[in-house]
């Protein structure tokens, strides 16, 4: 391979020499953007090699450069200020724009490949000057691994810095440690001196001089690349023992204080598939969004110092979020009586050294890099603030983005060794000629960002990124948009959280639930106003007219009231609920007002519509037709929390859920319309589900599915069904309540406040037609008969206390009272979580005649002490649509659901970043 490269370079030299009177000239420019940048891309030994090949090398004078100018001159370089003679100019960091020279080849770290805003003016000047820009960051091998990088020395310097920082932080917490004798990496002449200081600290540790009350120190290294290896190289100079990640918990409590413990974390140690907790490396590379990280629960609680060397990619799990940090900063309970002068650590995690310096990356709350001048900051997760002092509450953070500059001589030699084999072909580059005419190796060719005044084909995406970012910036700079959120129930949390991420939206929360509003206002920067929609029409109107958008999270019966106020004030509106007939009646008024009202933006309806339309539209683009569409969706308790007769729990009023089974439903099956009457007979339509067998699900049709043939544009379908999922046993239990007359919406005077209180036993006696004075055994016997001798249904009634002496809640109707009772019995506890399960099934007939059976699955779990699965999957798409309306991404006017690509496309893409990820599978039948 080397022989082939030499032959290619020899031919290139001959070709260039025929066209030029002199050999190409290379220049090493001085670094003049950052005061700490003392590195160079090549060391004197590399200059010597280049001059031996007969090339002229110019060295710009620099007193800042760590390697003296004399060393470069001794190696054959020519020291001079003017480098206009050079055709190749090498540097480490970006040059000032005014010093760029046209039609030259430059090589440096441009930091433009992600359309970084700070360097876009540089990129513009590079294009204007028709410069050929080679970016070291994109010099990669056939596996995509970087060939030239400073990563090793970033790891070395970062580790030295964080040990110094831990000394300061532990002192602030009341502990002198051997780390106090360590300095910042740049305080040492070279790494050998730093290593000796680390060894000295290690010797003191081995003598048992670490404070006993802080316990064993544990260091976790993420990644196995050069950064991690460089950090471990320093760590190994301490008296250390490496353990497996699963051993970390034990050693963090009982380890030897005369040593420190380390663990190297790879993907398989903390990444697991959301559905089954297994890690598949091949699948992860393709579908990282299917995985979550267990680092926050399995590793971080037993980590003293995290050394992070991995970059975060979109759709991949983060190591730590703000919520994780909050839980990690909870004080550790100890059985040991504290001694005032020998305190225990307030929490295990003391420090994070984020060598990746990837803001908003795998460490979500690392939003700004620190600097060599100010290397440390403290992150207070509870307040979500960063402060410079090493004192107070929080995690010590070090995230310097130019760490190798602290050890400039060794970093220069290391980097130059990797770059040197490619310098000659870069030197033979003629920036005035088309890129295609250059005989570059793939390593160099694929690192060319610009040439001949244009972005190269591989990097044209940068312009699109720029345009997208500039558009977002323009919108954020404009006047704050005003949003009124009506309703403070379970969905409001994710909506408020999502809309609060930027600083360009002023949110007002309106509700008649004062306590809920107060709790939400503590978490989010919002205004609150007490309003009862449906009873305070004038107040609602005055609130709406000052807004840019209204989000209604109220019960669906109140949406028309809100919509009328929006129509009168010409204000856009979104909601998660169904577009009911009452809303449909307002369609012309919405059109006349010239506003946009979007409904059905939640989960079901909502995400189910969006997935259906995306699949249908893609099929139509291929000339295929939809022969069948079946969608089932359900909000359920997590399996471990489903142990009750209904196999169900409620996070909001159960009235809607209960009344759903009383409604008729219709669907299309093999070309025939099937009508289902609600009430007692609905049990006949319940079907056991054969997918997700571990969940033991059943399903039943929901409302009128046949209308979606027109809405979805799939009149070709012979089967069309939308249904509800529940755990097996739910429908049977509810069927028993229907038989007993408990799901009845008619007014029941005996339950009104002015009536005498009733017990459930008395009410049930009334419902089954026996005297209230009847014995419990008599009531049980009559109820059993009423239930058709179904012992399971009887047990459900008994479990809920319906045959006992507990008082019936006051209400307008029996079902309202029953709902209140169910809330008291079957609400989620503080340590319980829910889940949502959805499956969409399509039969797609392709033009070839083949039938594709396609399924789309969604399973989402609620978060402990966070948002429920239902709240996330309903609230987030609603909030996203609201944001799209505010940002002008949705321009269509009128009353609509999320059936157009304009709406569903961005939402389905953005929802993935929130951890709501769909799994798609297809099989083809010939």
UniProtKB/Swiss-Prot annotation:
Region (Saccharopine dehydrogenase): 477-926
SMART domains associated with the record: AlaDh_PNT_C (SM01002), AlaDh_PNT_N (SM01003)
Gene Ontology terms, MF aspect: saccharopine dehydrogenase (NAD+, L-glutamate-forming) activity; saccharopine dehydrogenase (NADP+, L-lysine-forming) activity; saccharopine dehydrogenase activity
Residue numbers bearing the N6-succinyllysine modification: 93, 138, 274, 286, 333, 458, 523, 535, 584, 732, 761
EC number: 1.5.1.8, 1.5.1.9
Reaction catalysis annotation: L-saccharopine + NADP(+) + H2O = L-lysine + 2-oxoglutarate + NADPH + H(+); L-saccharopine + NAD(+) + H2O = (S)-2-amino-6-oxohexanoate + L-glutamate + NADH + H(+)
Amino acids binding L-saccharopine: 577-578, 604, 703, 724-726
BP GO annotations: L-lysine catabolic process; L-lysine catabolic process to acetyl-CoA via saccharopine; lysine biosynthetic process via aminoadipic acid; lysine catabolic process
Annotated region (Lysine-ketoglutarate reductase), positions in chain: 28-455
GO cellular component: cytoplasm; mitochondrion
N6-acetyllysine: residues carrying this PTM: 48, 52, 56, 93, 128, 138, 286, 458, 523, 535, 584, 707, 739, 761, 778, 780
Family: In the N-terminal section; belongs to the AlaDH/PNT family. In the C-terminal section; belongs to the saccharopine dehydrogenase family.
Record note on quaternary structure: Homotetramer.
Swiss-Prot/TrEMBL domain comment: The N-terminal and the C-terminal domains contain respectively the lysine ketoglutarate reductase and saccharopine dehydrogenase activity.
Function in brief: Bifunctional enzyme that catalyzes the first two steps in lysine degradation.
Protein name, per record: Alpha-aminoadipic semialdehyde synthase, mitochondrial
UniProt organism field: Rattus norvegicus (Rat)
Annotated gene: Aass
């Amino acid at each position: 391979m080397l022989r082939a490269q030499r032959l290619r370079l020899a031919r290139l030299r001959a070709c260039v020499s025929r066209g030029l009177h002199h050999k190409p000239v290379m220049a090493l420019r001085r670094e003049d953007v950052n005061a700490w940048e003392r590195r160079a891309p090549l060391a004197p030994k590399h200059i010597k090699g280049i001059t031996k090949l007969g090339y002229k090398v110019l060295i710009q004078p620099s007193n800042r450069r760590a390697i003296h100018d004399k060393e470069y001159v001794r190696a054959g370089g020519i020291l001079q200020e003017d480098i206009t003679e050079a055709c190749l100019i090498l540097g480490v960091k970006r040059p000032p724009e005014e010093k760029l020279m046209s039609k030259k080849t430059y090589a440096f770290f441009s930091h433009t490949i992600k359309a970084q805003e700070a360097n876009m003016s540089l990129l513009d000047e590079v294009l204007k000057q028709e410069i050929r820009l080679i970016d070291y960051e994109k010099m990669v091998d056939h596996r995509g691994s970087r060939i030239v990088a400073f990563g090793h020395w970033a790891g070395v310097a970062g580790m030295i810095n964080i040990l110094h920082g831990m000394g300061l932080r532990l002192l602030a917490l009341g502990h002198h440690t051997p780390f106090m004798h360590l300095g910042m990496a740049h305080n040492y002449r070279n790494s050998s001196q730093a290593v000796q200081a680390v060894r000295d600290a290690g010797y003191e540790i081995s003598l048992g001089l670490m404070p006993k009350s802080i316990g064993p120190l544990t260091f976790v290294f993420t990644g196995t690349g050069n950064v991690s290896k460089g950090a471990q190289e320093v760590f190994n100079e301490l008296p250390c023992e490496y353990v497996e990640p699963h051993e970390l918990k034990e050693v963090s409590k009982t380890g030897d204080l005369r040593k420190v413990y380390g663990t190297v974390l790879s993907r398989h140690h903390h990444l697991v598939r959301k559905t089954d907790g297994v890690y598949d490396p091949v699948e992860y590379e393709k579908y990282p969004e299917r995985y979550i990280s267990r680092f926050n629960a399995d590793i971080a609680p037993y980590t003293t110092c995290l050394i992070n060397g991995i970059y975060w990619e979109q759709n991949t799990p983060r190591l730590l979020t703000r919520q994780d940090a909050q839980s990690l900063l909870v004080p550790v309970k100890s059985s040991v009586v504290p001694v005032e002068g020998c305190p225990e650590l307030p929490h295990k995690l003391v420090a994070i050294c984020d060598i990746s310096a990837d803001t908003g990356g795998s460490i979500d709350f690392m939003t700004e890099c620190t600097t060599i001048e100010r290397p440390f900051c403290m992150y207070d997760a509870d307040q979500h603030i960063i402060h410079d002092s090493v004192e107070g509450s929080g995690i010590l953070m070090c995230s310097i983005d130019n760490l190798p500059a602290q050890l400039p001589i060794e970093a220069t030699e290391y980097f130059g060794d990797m770059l040197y084999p490619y310098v000659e072909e870069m030197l033979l580059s003629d920036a005035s000629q088309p890129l295609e005419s250059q005989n570059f190796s793939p390593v160099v060719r694929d690192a060319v960002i610009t040439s001949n005044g244009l972005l190269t084909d591989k990097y044209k995406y940068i312009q699109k990124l720029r345009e997208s970012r500039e558009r977002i910036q323009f919108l954020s700079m404009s006047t704050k948009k005003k949003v009124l959120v009506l309703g403070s129930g379970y969905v409001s949390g994710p909506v408020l959280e999502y809309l609060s991420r930027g600083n360009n939206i002023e949110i007002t929360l309106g509700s008649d639930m004062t306590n809920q509003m107060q709790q939400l206002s503590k978490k989010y920067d919002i205004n609150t106003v007490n309003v009862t929609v449906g009873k305070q029409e004038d107040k609602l109107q005055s609130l709406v007219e000052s807004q840019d958008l209204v989000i209604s999270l109220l019960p669906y019966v109140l949406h028309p009231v809100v919509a009328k106020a929006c129509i009168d004030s010409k204000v856009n509106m979104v909601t998660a609920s169904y577009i009911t007939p009452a809303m449909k009646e307002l369609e012309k008024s919405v059109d006349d007002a010239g506003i946009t009202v979007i409904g059905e933006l939640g989960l079901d309806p909502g995400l189910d519509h969006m997935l259906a339309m995306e699949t249908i539209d893609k099929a139509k683009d291929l000339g295929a037709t939809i022969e069948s569409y079946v969608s089932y969706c359900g909000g359920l308790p997590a399996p471990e929390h489903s142990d009750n007769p209904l196999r169900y729990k409620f996070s909001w009023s159960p009235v809607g859920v209960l009344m759903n089974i009383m409604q008729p439903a219709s669907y299309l099956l093999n070309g025939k319309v099937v009508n289902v009457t609600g009430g007692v007979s609905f049990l006949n339509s319940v079907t056991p589900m054969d997918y997700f067998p571990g969940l033991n699900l059943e399903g039943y049709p929901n409302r009128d599915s046949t209308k979606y043939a027109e809405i979805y544009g799939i009149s070709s379908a012979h089967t069309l069904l939308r249904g509800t999922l529940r755990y097996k046993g739910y429908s049977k239990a509810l069927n028993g309540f229907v038989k007993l007359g408990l799901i009845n919406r008619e007014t029941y005077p005996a339950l009104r406040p002015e009536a005498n209180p009733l017990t459930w036993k008395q009410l049930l006696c009334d419902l089954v037609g026996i005297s209230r004075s009847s014995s419990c055994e008599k009531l049980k016997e009559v109820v059993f008969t009423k239930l058709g001798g179904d012992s399971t249904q009887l047990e459900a009634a008994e479990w809920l206390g319906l045959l006992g002496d507990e008082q019936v809640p006051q209400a307008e109707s029996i079902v309202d009272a029953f709902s209140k009772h169910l809330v008291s019995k079957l609400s989620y506890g503080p340590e319980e979580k829910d889940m949502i399960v959805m499956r969409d099934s399509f039969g797609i007939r392709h033009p070839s005649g083949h039938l594709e059976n396609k399924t789309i699955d969604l399973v989402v779990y609620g978060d402990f002490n966070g948002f429920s699965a239902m709240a996330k999957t309903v609230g987030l798409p609603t909030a996203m649509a609201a944001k799209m309306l505010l940002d002008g991404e949705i321009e269509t006017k009128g009353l609509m659901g999320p059936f157009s690509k304009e709406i569903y496309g961005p939402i389905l893409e953005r929802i993935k970043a929130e951890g709501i990820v769909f799994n798609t599978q297809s099989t083809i039948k010939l």
